[in-house]
């Protein structure tokens, strides 16, 4: 390794990690005229929501659906970029006893009415949630639901809601978080798929950053967040075989609170904060099945959530809206399963097989029809979500010019890439306040 070189430029902010949260923060900051450097140790942007090629198919690593009409779109528009997605209609349907149910025709009452006599009581609780009337944060979604019904199909459906949005089981997700999302958040009503793979969205954000004076460095491994007199002074990183010091007035980390604490040095953070890092965060896992068929399995352009499965939670056919993601004559699918448990250790092999069995149950002849492209288990240091909703940490750290972004510091009840966009903008605003003070 060559001798360390100091970068003379002093950035307003250096942002570690070009996943959804880091990109959102960098994009908003550059739109406000701040000098920003976004760095990532991978060879492309997108983090756990990027895309790659397998045998001519464009396959997504994690997230596939990009939400429209809220913060995510606002951030991209701020740097002159449009959200390049195609919106399916209907966006979301449910597979109940082998039949497709479209909830847009009647909402929760319509969806649950054919399953349980308690449908109106459950629906009333969603109305209460919109008014801010929520259960205690210690009761799980499963326990809360048992207060209204024991119907297995209803419980499977709610479990699969939890799995699809938060990569958690109903006995792991607080009911307060569940109802906050469906009662007060966007609840994923409008979304679309990018015809270039989800990577295309992140590449557009990176282009917007560069067009507005920001910089994006890939294959750059941050080794250390540097401190002086209790404040961040920048980062030390390795790029192209050289150790480089980046000076910055602020540091934002999308690496998750655990890795961030290691980069800054746990001895520089107080005991209370480190207790949260070690004991509050609860990473959530899922299993992603990418496969293709030459015969369409189901004629639905959006996402299908299942009501009769134990592990498989939802599925989407990407070629219904974006045929260019697959070679001619092929239909490309992604299905998601969530292990039991999701927030603690599990046996990968048996959980993968359980998800496949659910696919076989829902689609007759699945093994003969489907070409499995890959199966990816998102867990550990590369999880589906860095913390299950209800167990997030704050964006602030004990160091006044160091912040966390991403899905370990979401707003209560939120989930997915949209949650990262919301947090990214919020952190960017705090950085701006700090810089302008």
Residue ranges and their predicted role:
Residues 2, 6, 318, 323-437:
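Conserved flavin/dinucleotide-binding core of flavoenzymes
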Residues 30-54:
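Glycine-rich FAD pyrophosphate-binding loop
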Residues 55-134, 147, 160:
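Dinucleotide-binding Rossmann-like beta1-alpha1 core, especially the glycine-rich loop
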Residues 181-242:
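Helical element adjacent to the flavin cofactor pocket in flavoenzyme catalytic cores
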Residues 223-331, 342-343:
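Mid-domain catalytic core of redox enzymes
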């Amino acid at each position: 390794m060559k001798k360390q070189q100091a970068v003379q430029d002093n950035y307003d902010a250096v942002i570690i990690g070009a996943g959804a949260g880091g990109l959102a923060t960098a994009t908003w900051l550059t739109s406000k005229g701040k000098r920003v450097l976004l760095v990532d140790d991978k060879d492309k942007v997108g983090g756990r929501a990027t895309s790659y090629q397998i045998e001519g198919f464009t396959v997504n690593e994690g997230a596939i659906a990009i939400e429209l009409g809220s913060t995510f779109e606002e951030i991209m528009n701020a740097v002159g970029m449009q959200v390049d997605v195609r919106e399916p209609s209907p966006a979301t349907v449910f597979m109940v006893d082998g039949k497709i149910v479209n909830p847009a025709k009647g909402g929760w009452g319509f969806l649950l009415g054919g399953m349980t006599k308690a449908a109106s009581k459950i629906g009333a609780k969603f109305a209460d949630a919109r008014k801010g009337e929520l259960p205690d944060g210690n009761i799980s979604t499963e326990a809360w639901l048992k207060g209204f019904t024991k119907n297995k199909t209803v419980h499977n459906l709610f479990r699969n809601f939890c799995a699809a949005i938060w990569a958690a089981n109903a006995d792991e997700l607080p009911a307060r978080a569940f109802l906050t999302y469906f009662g007060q958040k966007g609840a994923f009503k409008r979304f679309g798929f990018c015809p270039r793979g989800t990577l295309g969205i992140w590449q557009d954000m990176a282009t917007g950053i560069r067009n507005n004076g920001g910089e994006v460095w890939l294959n750059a491994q941050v080794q250390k967040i540097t401190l002086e007199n209790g404040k961040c002074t920048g980062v030390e990183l390795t790029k192209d075989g050289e150790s480089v010091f980046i000076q910055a007035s602020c540091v934002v980390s999308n690496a998750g609170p655990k890795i961030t604490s290691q980069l800054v040095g746990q001895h520089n953070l107080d005991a209370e904060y480190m207790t949260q890092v070690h004991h509050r965060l609860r990473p959530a896992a899922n299993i992603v099945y990418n496969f293709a068929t030459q015969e369409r399995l189901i004629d639905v352009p959006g996402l299908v959530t299942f009501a009769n499965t134990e592990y498989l939670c939802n599925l989407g056919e990407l070629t219904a809206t974006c045929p260019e993601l697959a070679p001619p004559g092929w239909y490309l699918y992604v299905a998601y399963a969530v292990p039991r448990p999701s927030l603690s250790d599990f046996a990968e092999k048996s959980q993968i097989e359980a998800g496949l069995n659910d696919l076989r149950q829902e689609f007759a002849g699945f093994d003969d029809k489907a070409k499995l492209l890959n199966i990816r288990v998102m867990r550990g240091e590369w999880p589906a979500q860095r913390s299950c909703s209800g167990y997030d940490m704050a964006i602030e750290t004990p160091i006044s010019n160091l912040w966390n972004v991403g899905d370990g510091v979401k707003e209560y009840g939120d989930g997915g890439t949209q949650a990262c966009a919301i947090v990214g903008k919020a952190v960017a605003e705090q950085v701006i306040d700090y810089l302008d003070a």
